[in-house]
Amino acid sequence: MVHYKSVFYKSAALVCGFVLAGASVAIASSEAAAKTRSKMSEFKRRAVSSPSGGRLSVLDGSFTALANDASFFEANPAGSANMTHSELTFAHTVGFNNSHAETLSYVGQSGNWGYGASMRMFFPESGFNFSPSTGPVCTPASNPIKKLGGLGIVNFSRRFGGLSIGANLKAGFRDAQGLTHLSLGTDVGLQWVGNVAKFFSSAEPNMYVGLSATNLGFTVKLPGSPFVLCRATGEQCCKTCSGRCTGVGTCCNGEKPCCKDCDCNCPCQDEATPGSPHATDTMLRAGFAYRPLSWFLFSVGVATRVNVSNLQVDHSGSALPMRLG
């Protein structure tokens, strides 16, 4: 016998999920399109990051609360202790501008302990290319930045009843058109799971709360030949963009006129000397999820990016960039 009412509810919930996912992707696309100026200058503070997994990509900040599959690593490191099963996964993730990442992850449990490891490589649209440079050194800011890199994560967490505490140790490297950085850092997280106002029978909890701080660490710019290449082919771009362009000539290898705001992607914009560390941009995340019925899940999350060096300089309490998901 077919229970049409149950099928209808499940179908409606699925449609709502697709609508919300589409809205999240649309918002992310508009944000990416709006931030096309001086992108290379921000890379010195970015940790190597390669989120993977369908649930993390769609739920974003709210997955900080759930964190209940192998994509939990960069959402909430406390998730491994509250999982009820082990997972071995391989994920192929395609991002914007056809960039992609390959991820191999394992998570397991032993008593009240959770543990896991994840290895990731990410590539530009050109594919598996391990050449010294991933593309032209100096390009228009409207062009995507080609990135090549790898990331390794080791996770441990401990459960105390419904509360778990976890941490990741992570290391990675990234080459972004000649701007090469090595990143070392850690993630910390807190998760609570339990049963509250539950109207269905299941061994799984129906309420989740999560907090995490990811990418606590530093990046170091590595010396290399791409900067010699940068000075040779991108000299005009770097010099005119670092000052105030008079409008004479072009930059970005002649592809786009130069302006005083430096509308270029050029490694020379990173003024740091090789070997000098920079504090990474830390992501602060919070999430809440509630499942009153077997076919319905409500979740909400928030994430914001901060940098320790900025907080030390600016005490004005200016608004931090924040997103809901």
Swiss-Prot record:
Keywords noted in UniProt: Signal
Record bears the keyword Hydrolase: no
Signal sequence segment: 1-28
InterPro entries named in the record: UPF0164
Lyase found in the keyword field: no
Organism taxonomic ancestry: Bacteria, Pseudomonadati, Spirochaetota, Spirochaetia, Spirochaetales
Family recorded in the similarity comment: Belongs to the UPF0164 family.
Any one Pfam family match given in the protein's UniProt record, by short name: UPF0164
Protein name, per record: UPF0164 protein TP_0856
